[in-house]
Amino acid sequence: SNFKLNMLYNEIEEVLRSVYDPEIPVNIVDLGLVYKLEVGEAGKVKIIMTLTAPGCPVAGDIVAEVQQKTEAVEGVTDVYVHLTFDPPWNREMMTEEAKLELGFL
């Protein structure tokens, strides 16, 4: 049902808020690094995300953390994390909270 999918979506988003960028002390959701979060019928999850900088030395770690934490959410059966740098991330993608926290506002 849609209700179930919405619940799952919210739960995954919560979990993603516990993943932090190594360079900036803000979680990847508020930073705007998660471009797309799709939750499919059978608990299949697709995440399209970026990093603040291409060639980030811990890129693999962040992707692995996203994968592991999402897989651990009850109801999730499959997780596909795709890393992209198109479009490249910029500060405008951050939430207002993140901008405030970092003093950009």
Spans of model-derived segments:
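Domain-level signature for proteins that mediate thiol-based redox and metal-cofactor handling
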Residues: F3-L105
